[in-house]
Amino acid sequence: RTIIITGCGGLLGIEFIKVLLSKGHTVIGTEISDSKINKISEMIQDVNFSCLKCDVSSEKEVVSFFKHLSGLKNFPDTLINNASITSEYLKENDLEPLSFIETSYQSWQKCMDTNLGGVFLMSKEFVKLSQELAPKKAKKIINISSIYALHGPNPKLYEDTGIKSFAAYSASKAGVIGLTKWMAGFLAPYNFTCNSIAPGGVFNNHSKIFEQALSSMIPLERMANPNDISGTVSFLCSEESNYINGQVLYVDGGYSSR
């Protein structure tokens, strides 16, 4: 398959690229900055991988991105909507998430525009061009959501950890699930399947305090590793998942079962 991965330079995105390339797929990634593109291009040097600049919250950039892809011999048949503003993203860019009452509408909207609006814009253009260029081919859309879409975070988990949860993240990821289910029904007649993955907490150099606190809430007693999530992505990209549509796959070690 030829697969698009948005936000490919993040912790999960990099792992997705690696596992999909190992399965023989061609991967086209997107990132928002030249520095991230250069970093990921140095890290992953493979003839079947390329990375292009695209802000998924910008309709102009998304349209331009797909216009470029329309000239390819093999137009992509799979879209993985992975780009999002997370607590880790805010920390990396020295943008501390504010408390609920301190959050400005502008900050709220920026998160919504990326986490939910980006899924809409990318999916819309992907569907539009797929119907023009490969209407009979089976297509897949995989949206990365979160366990916090349907399970609110436990405030006690974040006490004395230095990590903050922010409302727009949970709300936007819940919207991703709603959009996934809508697309699954309405796009099925046009040879699309649409599914969502809801990862649990993925270890990313968290403090020992946070790791232990979260692990105690998970039946498997550990946080996820990136490859725990990438295996599910690989499965949804495979032919073995062709009859799965409109589903949310929780990859959380059993956290949501409690």
Model-derived features: where do they sit?
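Short C-terminal tail/terminal secondary-structure segment
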Residues: 97, 153, 216, 234, ...
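Alpha-helical segment proximal to the catalytic Tyr-Lys
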Residues: 128, 185-186, 242
